[in-house]
Amino acid sequence: MIQRHELCKDLVAWVFNNPDQPQSLEGVIKELHTTRASLSQGCKESLGIGPMEVLRNIRLEHVHQALKDPEIRQRLNVKSVEDIRKHYGFQSRGNFAAIYADYFGEKPYATMKRASKTSIPN
């Protein structure tokens, strides 16, 4: 169980340390030198959710940060919610907006708009 718990920690660390890398489950499994079953069981034991949901939640956090921070958008060369959504691998516009709103309590466009109102010009 300790090894599976460590796999989940490694998954979270890898995704946070590689935010600009494509983050497919198969790619992460390969990076972590593990199996889908071990990673799945480790995530469920540690966090109560599967690795796909872990990946999705972390990607949502990355999206949220990019929507709030113009410096991140500039570094990634993305300008719109649509660009950010695509950059982080969310395929369906409608599904993405619904998932984002459930997770953060507001639509992605509202996050970006609110952030632009509160940012202080240089």
Sequence positions of predicted segments:
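Short, leucine-enriched amphipathic alpha-helices that occur as contiguous helical runs
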Residues: 4-12, 56-64
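…primarily DNA-binding HTH/wHTH and HhH modules…
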Residues: 62-74, 78-79, 83-122
